[in-house]
Amino acid sequence: MKKVTVDDFSSPENMHDVIGFYKKLTEHQEPLIRLDDYYGLGPAWVALRHDDVVTILKNPRFLKDVRKFTPLQDKKDSIDDSTSASKLFEWMMNMPNMLTVDPPDHTRLRRLASKAFTPRMIENLRPRIQQITNELLDSVEGKRNMDLVADFSFPLPIIVISEMLGIPPLDQKRFRDWTDKLIKAAMDPSQGAVVMETLKEFIDYIKKMLVEKRNHPDDDVMSALLQAHEQEDKLSENELLSTIWLLITAGHETTAHLISNGVLALLKHPEQMRLLRDNPSLLPSAVEELLRYAGPVMIGGRFAGEDIIMHGKMIPKGEMVLFSLVAANIDSQKFSYPEGLDITREENEHLTFGKGIHHCLGAPLARMEAHIAFGTLLQRFPDLRLAIESEQLVYNNSTLRSLKSLPVIF
């Protein structure tokens, strides 16, 4: 197998057979790969094994805080600070949120944000999520066809997180436009200016909303965050803006792709789709298996907080240490028949939501949305099938496993 480059992890060609690509990668590469360059930010390491990924996720020697260990800080002379990735790192250094910092800041920020994601609050959303799902499917039922991405998998989580935050319905489409623009620009080193322009538009909108919430507080997450105090330690202005930005983007982008990827996986495994359609009680295990098999987040990352030796290789302090969630989720040492889809799989320690202190805060909400989306879709449209050949589907050039569209008929 040829030397691996960063483009291999996001090329649309490999997206057509993600499992096959990572299976070949794990069979022909060492468990820790070194990339010569990661989007203009210098060299990086990529861990492929489940156990190694768990170590990186949970061991405090691997750090998140880009303010401490970003290449922009340590290697200013050798890094092009005009690239899209550099601009994104620069923004993250100035706009910290719980995803980009370590304790004690992480502990404080997560505690404040978690007040919006208590089990009771998530469970209280169930009727509304079901209602939104029904309304979206009602709107396409008469046509007997839809683009599952545009008509269903994207609108559902956008509406849910927008209502949680108290964002007007007419503004919700902006979020998809901004996140689409950001993701595309971030993959192109020449688009640094576009990254910064898009982030500015996004943050300016949040600032405008915060002014309205200060003047007219409501029973929503944004109003609650404005009032948030923890041991007299208030969210700073930048922390507040970045936390809301994170909730908006993480609250819809990944769930949308989970739903569309999951439906495609079922369509490509008709025996599994029939089994789920005829046995709705399998929905909990089906959701976990689709998270493992078709999860949208393919790559995550940390920084080495000190010189670290893994598999006999020295990772210098400050270098990026990436990990492949896809490879970890098909590790044959952890899963039986890992490259197969089995919605009855019982032991399923997938890493799609991460591990440790950065475990996805919105995991219960994403699970609920997926459970309702898959179950209702198969109940309403039992003859659901692809409208085109799967080879004709187009994937985004992204580190997220994401379809541009998914035409289906029913």
From Swiss-Prot:
| Binding residue positions for heme | 106, 110, 302, 358, 360
Q: Where do transmembrane segments lie in this chain?
A: none
Q: What family does the entry list? A: Belongs to the cytochrome P450 family.
- Enzyme Commission (EC) number: 1.14.-.-
- Give the biotechnological use: Could be a valuable biocatalyst used in the industrial field for an efficient biotransformation of mevastatin.
Q: What CDD domains does the record tag this protein with?
A: CYP107-like
Keywords of this protein's UniProt record, alphabetized? Heme, Iron, Metal-binding, Monooxygenase, Oxidoreductase, Plasmid
Protein species of origin: Priestia megaterium (strain ATCC 12872 / QMB1551) (Bacillus megaterium)
Query: What is the official name of this protein in its record?
Result: Cytochrome P450 CYP107DY1
What superkingdom heads the lineage?
Bacteria
Cofactor(s) it depends on: heme
